[in-house]
């Protein structure tokens, strides 16, 4: 008979889940960049590809510009978009939009290469968690309950795919309103 009840349950956010899995499966001791470190690595990445850039060839050295660029890279990471993909789309797109995408792809690619050789970017945590779960059966035979979400990013989807693959059962509770249109507050849950 399988154990059941509160003494055997854990309440984990995605971040706490990553910490738990890495502490059990290895990898928790890897260094992670803080906010300042991320800005410095991004600046170094930008400088390393500056000669190949068109739109961002003469970038502002102000922290606000780098912070804005880092916010863009964070969004791309959450949607599992790589620098290589951006560069390719940029080369296929004409005009200023294509040049911007190409430049962003080059910068992003350089940033990824630098973080791969040194400290981990914290925005890679979910991707790293999904990769670890492919090799470490943390959810094997477990009953999992998800609550408090209205939708999931593709990066979270990678983790959920591994959870679904391993778990005995998965129950997902979504807040949902009847009869509301696509613009309503519950529209993201409806699409999930």
Short names for language-model regions:
Residues 1-138, 187:
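Basic/charged alpha-beta structural segments of nucleotide/phosphate-handling enzymes
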Residues 10, 143-145, 171-173:
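A structural signal for isolated positions on well-ordered beta-strands in alpha/beta enzyme cores
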Residues 17, 150-151, 177-179:
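Short, solvent-exposed loop/turn segments at secondary-structure junctions
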Residues 96-97, 144-145, 178:
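A short, structure-level motif marking secondary-structure boundaries and short turns
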Residues 126, 150, 159:
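Active-site and donor-binding regions of nucleotide-sugar-utilizing enzymes
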Residues 136-141, 164-165:
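Flexible, charged surface loops at secondary-structure boundaries
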Residues 139-152:
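Conserved P-loop NTPase "ATPase switch" module shared by AAA+ and STAND
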Residues 156-192:
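Conserved RecA-like helicase ATPase core segment
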């Amino acid at each position: 008979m399988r154990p059941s009840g509160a003494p055997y349950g854990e309440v984990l956010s995605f971040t706490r889940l990553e910490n738990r899995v890495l502490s059990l499966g290895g990898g928790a001791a890897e260094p992670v960049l803080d906010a300042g470190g991320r800005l410095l690595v991004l600046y170094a990445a930008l400088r390393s590809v500056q000669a190949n850039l068109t739109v961002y060839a003469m970038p502002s050295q102000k922290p606000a510009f780098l912070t804005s660029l880092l916010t863009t890279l964070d969004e791309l990471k959450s949607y599992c978009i790589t620098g290589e993909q951006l560069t390719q789309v940029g080369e296929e797109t004409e005009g200023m939009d294509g040049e911007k995408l190409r430049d962003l792809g080059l910068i992003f690619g350089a940033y990824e290469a630098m973080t791969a050789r040194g400290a981990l970017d914290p925005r890679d945590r979910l991707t790293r968690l999904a990769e670890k779960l492919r090799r470490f059966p943390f959810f094997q035979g477990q009953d999992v309950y998800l609550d408090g979400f209205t939708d999931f990013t593709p990066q979270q989807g990678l983790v959920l795919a591994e959870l679904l693959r391993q778990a005995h059962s998965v129950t997902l509770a979504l807040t949902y309103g009847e009869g509301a249109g696509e613009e309503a507050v519950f529209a993201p849950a409806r699409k999930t």
